[in-house]
Regions:
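Ampiphathic alpha-helical segments that act as solvent-exposed interaction surfaces
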Residues: 30, 121-125, 170
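Generic marker of residues within folded, mature protein domains
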Residues: 20, 92, 145-147
Length: 170
């Protein structure tokens, strides 16, 4: 991709971001302040959290159906391996806007460092994806940005026992 095309793409992305930021901020704050009805059912109470300022904005066609297809594709990849998956990944919420990753074995993601190691691995996978390569963002975007492209508002990762970390995507 030429420098001009990259610059133009960045300008368009910045314009879209500025245009949507005002509407998104109010919705995101309301979402963050709601009680987490999935804590205590799919994972233990939140033990830590952070906010990620995404470099991406949701794609125009990002909807519930697209998010479910995305999760289904990830799950199919996990299940196609010759060994049992170490974690389950699924979407919840009225619009499937909440991504949840839960370890299936004791000690899998019981520290923030192990959780971040998985998220870094998912970033490496995302950066090799056709989508990132088509947009020319494989050096800049992370797995969090990929989740934002699909319209996810948060990612929760847990060991399923005592540790749960939640990332709010802005």
């Amino acid at each position: 991709m030429s420098k001009f095309a990259r610059g133009f793409a960045a300008l368009v992305a910045a314009t879209v971001l500025i245009a949507t930021l005002g509407a998104a901020v109010g919705t995101a704050v309301a979402e963050e302040n709601k009680p987490d009805r999935h804590a205590g059912y799919y994972y233990p109470p939140i033990t830590s959290s952070e906010t990620y300022e995404a470099r991406a904005v949701a794609m125009a066609d990002a909807d519930r159906s697209q998010r479910i297809k995305f999760i289904n594709n990830l799950t199919e990849q996990l299940l196609s391996r010759p060994y049992p998956p170490e974690y389950a990944i699924f979407a919840k919420g009225d619009e499937a806007q909440k991504m949840i990753i839960v370890g299936r074995r004791p000690g899998t993601f019981n520290t923030i460092y192990r959780a971040r190691a998985l998220l870094a691995t998912l970033t490496a996978v995302a950066r090799s994806s056709r989508l990132f390569n088509e947009f020319g963002v494989q050096e800049y975007f992370t797995f969090f940005d990929l989740a934002k492209l699909f319209g996810f508002s948060r990612i929760t990762i847990s060991d399923g026992e005592s540790f749960t970390h939640q990332i709010h995507l802005k």
